[in-house]
Amino acid sequence: MSKNTVSSARFRKVDVGEYDENKFVDEEDGGDGQAGPDEGEVDSCLRQGNMTAALQAALKNPPINTKSQAVKDRAGSIVLKVLISFKANDIEKAVQSLDKNGVDLLMKYIYKGFESPSDNSSAVLLQWHEKALAAGGVGSIVRVLTARKTV
């Protein structure tokens, strides 16, 4: 019996502390270089009246991996500015132009806008939420609420 135990003791070389669920290691993906969406490109599209291109530009290069709250706030304000400038009739077309990841990202920005409401932004965000929910389904809400990386 003891011979069997000694020969099979190799399994004990695993460091069980490595798999401790209470040991948190923050993953650093090197996202400090992310500056968020290009505000000049977004403003240019808004001035030209190309709202869908403005939305695409605002959702491009999201600051998900950065820890800088100032960059995240600036990106959120750019996206909110684009969402508010849409007409109610054009919202559904714009949401339909996004892919699944784009709808999820849009939903993240919608919930970010709900966190700090400004003048009349809640009504507009609710319209966007309705259309994004129709396009992405309940799964997009679940993915946004359970995501560890925020915008």
From Swiss-Prot:
Component of the Arp2/3 complex composed of ACTR2/ARP2, ACTR3/ARP3, ARPC1B/p41-ARC, ARPC2/p34-ARC, ARPC3/p21-ARC, ARPC4/p20-ARC and ARPC5/p16-ARC. This is Actin-related protein 2/3 complex subunit 5. One of its GO terms (cellular component) is cytosol. The modification N-acetylserine is found at residue 2. Component of the Arp2/3 complex, a multiprotein complex that mediates actin polymerization upon stimulation by nucleation-promoting factor (NPF). The Arp2/3 complex mediates the formation of branched actin networks in the cytoplasm, providing the force for cell motility. In addition to its role in the cytoplasmic cytoskeleton, the Arp2/3 complex also promotes actin polymerization in the nucleus, thereby regulating gene transcription and repair of damaged DNA. InterPro entries: ARPC5, ARPC5_sf. SUPFAM superfamilies: Arp2/3 complex 16 kDa subunit ARPC5 (SSF69103). Keywords: Acetylation, Actin-binding, Cell projection, Cytoplasm, Cytoskeleton, Nucleus, Ubl conjugation. It is found in: Cytoplasm, Cytoskeleton; Cell projection; Nucleus. Coiled coil: none annotated. GO terms for molecular function: actin filament binding. Residues 21-42 are annotated as: Disordered. GO terms for biological process: Arp2/3 complex-mediated actin nucleation; cell migration; regulation of actin filament polymerization. Pfam families: P16-Arc. Polyubiquitinated by RNF128 with 'Lys-63'-linked chains, leading to proteasomal degradation. Belongs to the ARPC5 family.
